[in-house]
Amino acid sequence: MAHTYCSALFHCVFSTRERRRAIAPEFQERLWAYMGGVARENEMKALGVGGTEDHAHLLLSLPSTMTIAGAMQKIKSGSSLWLHRSCGLTGFEWQKGYGAFTIGCSQIDATLAYIAGQKEHHRKRDFQAEFLSILKRHGVDYDPRYVWG
């Protein structure tokens, strides 16, 4: 083939350091928009970004030249720096790890609705229960002793 064609969709999830409720509601919409901008600047497409005080969800389309580890490094470091400089959250940190789960095109709308409904969703279930449920749904093996560091 003369060109490379790729469809790589990832539902990415990561929390604040020690799952602290560090992302105040007044910063959230700006943070989600900023994360989308970091994605655009790095040739990714952020189809959806959202979350709550202690974690973020992104639905990303990655170019064929980018690894998921590279994408997470750019988004997490860029958004952390932005929170330090623009919001005065100088002690803010994301956790070291993340979850990245592939989805098919038929799952885009459901994943976007899930991301958009985070505030409502977390009135009933905390982040830890949510993340373990995602791991199970995607068939990811894990040792509960090491999920949270």
Task: Go through the PLM ranges and name each one.
Residues 1-149:
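Basic nucleic-acid-binding interfaces
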